[in-house]
Structure formats: structure tokens, C-alpha cells
Amino acid sequence: MFKEFKEFAMKGNMVSLAIGVVIGGAFSKIVTSLVNDIIMPLVGLLMGRVDFSNLFFTLGSGNFKTVQEAKDAGVATVNYGIFINNIIDFLIVAFSIFIIIQQISKLTKKKGENIVPDKKKCKYCYTEINSQATRCPNCTSELKEN
């Protein structure tokens, strides 16, 4: 069982996925910092010194200046400013991933144009076979190279 797990874990896709998750986590921290520390303060300044992380309304009685004051008083709050920050964070991450995938697709398309196809069909039995095969494994016909 350990041997099977080792084979599974060492496959190229599994390692690539693990690397992608680690890099994605680090990238997410960078984007979150960009949104919270650079973009939203600038937007808040342009809108009259609004601090988006402190935009909220209470679901109970009382008048509180900050989210923390309301939480300390035990009053439930709807923190729509933090939600706006998270939406902007998500949009930046989604757009960045879109751009990266688009560029990778362009690169692989250009590289893939000159590659010999992996599969071809046997002209006798129409079975899909390896493009470098000289004999069909299904009908055993000898295949002449094109």
C-alpha cells in the first residue's frame, strides 16, 4: 500500500498540483496585501477618507464607531466593507489566473503545432494506435510509414 501511495504521489501531476497550491497560497497573500494595504486606502481616500474595513451595520441596538467596539459589546454586525475588500481581492486573483492561463495556452499551442501526434488510426481496422507503431496490435497488419 505504501508503494502504491509513493507511485501516486510521485506522478508529475501530483507534484505539479502541490507546487501550484503552495505558489497559489503565496500569491493570494500578495494580492490580499495589495488590496488591503494599497488599493483600498487609495479608493477610500478618493471617496473622502473612507476606511472600507470599518464599514458595517449592527443587528442589535447601540451606536458603535468601529466593528471591534460592537463585537466587544456582543452585538452582531454585518461587515460589508470587509466583504467589498474580499470581492476586489477575488477579482484580482481571478483576472491574474486568467491572464496566466491565457499566456500558457498561447505558449503550448505554439509548441504543440510542430509535435507529431501521439495517436493514429490503423487503415485496416481503424483502431487508434501509437503514431510510431509499425504493426497494428489489434489486427496485426503491417503498417507502412507515410
UniProtKB/Swiss-Prot annotation:
Keywords: Cell membrane, Ion channel, Ion transport, Membrane, Transmembrane, Transmembrane helix, Transport. SUPFAM superfamilies: Gated mechanosensitive channel (SSF81330). GO terms for molecular function: mechanosensitive monoatomic ion channel activity. It is a multi-pass membrane protein. InterPro entries: MS_channel, MSC/AndL, MscL_channel. GO terms for cellular component: plasma membrane. It comes from the Bacteria. It is found in: Cell membrane. The chain crosses the membrane at residues 15-35, 81-101. HAMAP family: MscL. Homopentamer. Channel that opens in response to stretch forces in the membrane lipid bilayer. May participate in the regulation of osmotic pressure changes within the cell. Belongs to the MscL family. This is Large-conductance mechanosensitive channel. It comes from Clostridium beijerinckii (strain ATCC 51743 / NCIMB 8052) (Clostridium acetobutylicum). The lineage of its organism: Bacteria, Bacillati, Bacillota, Clostridia, Eubacteriales. The gene is mscL.
